[in-house]
Each structure stands twice: as C-alpha cells, then as structure tokens.
Amino acid sequence: MFDTLLINAYVITMDEKRRVLENGAVGIENGRISFVGDTEEGKKFGAKEVIDCKNHVVMPGFVDAHGHGGHSAFKSIVEDTSYWMPVMTHTYKNYITDEFWYNEGRLSALERLHAGVTTGVCVLGSQPRCDSPVPAMNNAKAYAEVGVKDIVCTGPCHTPWPHRFSRYVNGERHM
C-alpha cells in the first residue's frame, strides 16, 4: 500500500523510452517514489491518500532551477576563495576543449540524476563562453544521452568584448 498515490496525471517518465503516460500514476511510500505507471495498475496497490491530478503534469524527480555548465568538473578547484571567478573565467576562455563540454555535461547530468534531479537549468553561454554554440551543443547532447531534461541558457550576460577567446580543436589552439 502506498502512502500517497497520484492518479489520472500526464506523467513524464525517466524510463529508457522517455514515455509520457496520459493516464499515469505515481505511488509514494516512506517519502520515496516507488511506482510509476498506469492509474488502473497503481490503484491495485491501494493508498492511504489518493490525489486526482486530472489535467495536470507530474514529473517524478526534483527540478534544479540553477546550475552552471563547466562547474561540476571544477567544483573543488580554488573553491571558497576570492580569486575563483578570475581563475575559472581565464580557464574557460583559454584552455577548454570542445570535448570538455560534453564530458562535463555528462558528469553534471549523472550527478544530478544521482541526487534525484530529473530536470535542470544549465547557464552556459555567459561571458566565459559565448563565442561559439559548440559548448552549449556538446553539453546538451550529454544531458540528452543520460536522459536528464535540461534547459540550456546561452548568451552573454555581459558583452564579451574586448575579451579574447580561444578553443582547442584536435590538439591545436585557435584564437
């Protein structure tokens, strides 16, 4: 028996097929999601509390409304210091490969998923990396492959000029 059963919802799943259940249910036991499936199937288990979610969307998992691309891979480097931002901004502008953004996105998505986050926001294209769409595309590709839904926010928060950017492509630095 569930503590709570949400029924008749549009349930956006995290399964391999990324199904959307039109008459879905989510069962909760001891504060944890223990069932995601069809409403009729969920009702068979019984519940102390049943909540009708007709015409509502249920997305099992947490939503992280603020994250920054690149930071997962560097979270322990010079953290809690006054010079963290200048060091990281210089690093992002001059020493990061296109593959880094894919690998960092994968790491970040897996860490979020491990914490129960199924949807997140990734601020990526700010001043440190607004010269090319490649970082955002690679980061988003990794999130999609893991299955975490991600909203990538791109575009400069401050004008990037007169800053100089470089990228490493096939081991060669391009200015």
Give the ranges of each region predicted by the language model:
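Short, glycine/charged-enriched secondary-structure capping and boundary segments
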Residues: 20-22, 41, 77-80, 134-137, ...
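Alpha-helical scaffold segments that flank or form the walls of functional sites
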Residues: 76-149
